[in-house]
From Swiss-Prot:
Belongs to the AdoMet synthase family. Detected in liver (at protein level). Expressed in liver. It comes from Rattus norvegicus (Rat). ATP binds at residues 30, 180-182, 248-251, 259, 265-266, 282, 286, 290. The keyword Metal-binding applies. HAMAP family: S_AdoMet_synth1. It is an enzyme of class 2 (transferase). K(+) binds at residue 58. Keywords: ATP-binding, Disulfide bond, Magnesium, Metal-binding, Nucleotide-binding, One-carbon metabolism, Potassium, S-nitrosylation, Transferase. Changing residue 180 to G: Loss of S-adenosylmethionine synthase activity, but does not abolish polyphosphatase activity. Pathway: Amino-acid biosynthesis; S-adenosyl-L-methionine biosynthesis; S-adenosyl-L-methionine from L-methionine: step 1/1. GO terms for molecular function: ADP binding; amino acid binding; ATP binding; identical protein binding; magnesium ion binding; methionine adenosyltransferase activity. This is S-adenosylmethionine synthase isoform type-1.
Length: 397
């Protein structure tokens, strides 16, 4: 069932314009994702009591320990111990036999007030629409017509494999599963005048933490039959698809016991799986004044709206900001040759006419003061219809 362990496999692509692309995802119990979820749980806890809270919360985890650190200015009174432990419990680390236990882990808190230097230049004595960017930076939004979600198939499938394993674990169907998991999907594509069309799944990799009582053969069989076949459309699988299921052979030690975790280390998993581009700023634990998050959400909103309006089949949108300045410094659009309109003039005019990308307007248009962020912290921030930035705007052009 599993592919060759010596790395030898057929990488030939007979069709002109064909290429392969790979994306990965991680599950809720991956140590970096634990930290993302805790940071966003802290953000949500503040927003529930104080929608104007200024939050920059980082998390570190290792065996038996969680550290919260960062800067928060808020009217809320938060029980950080409870927020952290409830999050770990929800993820599924509820027994020391799993290597991490919400009941017994040590929670350290090193949170300070937001720097007054930042506050005075970003939001103090300003109307909300004129709130400045919380820092300089560049952010990207990407969309492609290859899936209904306007997301790359590679990352869509990688996320769905992890989601499926979590569902089977929580329902008790596969009781040997534990929370830490990683997936990776390679898809063969063909190019079509700048757009990309998925043809087949070339390779699937799944590594998931498990208990001691399950055999390798039984795990591989269950992962193929109950995870992969339930998630990946049959039209993309064929007799040449390669599977690397539990390729290490054993994954009992996982979560923070296996690796240290830190907020913001899965930025490609969080976005487009390597497609498009990334400005480097992470999302989790940050309120809307941090344009790393809010402007990246807005750029995705712009990109998806352009594709859904039929103005292009594939697009990358870049925006940039300076600290304390509300208006973006630049807006750039790249359509890979898939639009009949010019990028610099016509499409940019459409964007400027339909979108106001100041942080104080983004927060209003996308309702970013609501405590919605813990849900975003696993399985990707994009391509999920429950989030406002995934609802295309009806464009006037």
């Amino acid at each position: 069932m599993n592919g060759p362990v010596d790395g030898l496999c057929d990488h030939s692509l007979s069709e002109e314009g064909a290429f392969m692309f790979t994306s990965e995802s991680v599950g809720e119990g991956h140590p970096d994702k634990i930290c993302d979820q805790i940071s966003d749980a802290v953000l949500d806890a503040h927003l529930k009591q104080d929608p104007n809270a200024k939050v920059a919360c980082e998390t570190v985890c290792k065996t038996g320990m969680v550290l919260l650190c960062g800067e928060i200015t808020s009217m809320a009174m938060i029980d950080y111990q409870r927020v952290v432990r409830d999050t770990i419990k929800h993820i599924g680390y509820d027994d020391s036999a799993k290597g991490f236990d919400f009941k017994t882990c040590n929670v350290l808190v090193a949170l300070e007030q937001q720097s007054p230097d930042i506050a005075q230049c970003v939001h103090l004595d300003r109307n909300e629409e004129d709130v400045g960017a919380g820092d300089q930076g560049l952010m990207f939004g990407y969309a492609t017509d290859e899936t209904e979600e306007c997301m790359p198939l590679t990352i869509v499938l990688a996320h769905k494999l992890n989601t499926r394993m979590a569902d089977l674990r929580r329902s008790g169907v596969l009781p040997w599963l534990r929370p830490d998991s990683k997936t990776q999907v390679t898809v063969q594509y063909v190019q079509d005048n700048g757009a990309v069309i998925p043809v087949r799944v070339h390779t699937i990799v799944i590594s998931v933490q498990h208990n001691e009582d399950i055999t390798l053969e039984a795990m591989r069989e269950a992962l193929k039959e109950q995870v992969i076949k339930a998630v990946v459309p049959a039209k993309y699988l064929d007799e040449d698809t390669i599977y690397h299921l539990q390729p290490s052979g054993r994954f009992v030690i996982g979560g923070p016991q296996g690796d240290a975790g830190v907020t913001g280390r899965k930025i490609i998993v969080d976005t487009y799986g390597g497609w498009g581009a990334h400005g480097g700023g992470a999302f989790s634990g940050k309120d809307y004044t941090k344009v790393d998050r809010s402007a990246a959400y807005a750029a995705r909103w712009v990109a998806k709206s352009l594709v859904k309006a039929g103005l292009c089949r594939r697009v990358l949108v870049q925006v940039s900001y300076a600290i304390g300045v509300a208006e973006p410094l630049s807006i750039s659009i790249f359509t890979y040759g898939t639009s009949k309109k010019t990028e610099r003039d016509e499409l940019l005019e459409v964007v400027n006419k339909n979108f106001d990308l100041r942080p104080g307007v983004i927060v209003r248009d996308l309702d970013l003061k609501k405590p919605i962020y813990q849900k975003t912290a696993c399985y990707g921030h994009f391509g999920r219809s429950e989030f406002p930035w995934e609802v295309p705007k009806k464009l006037v052009f």
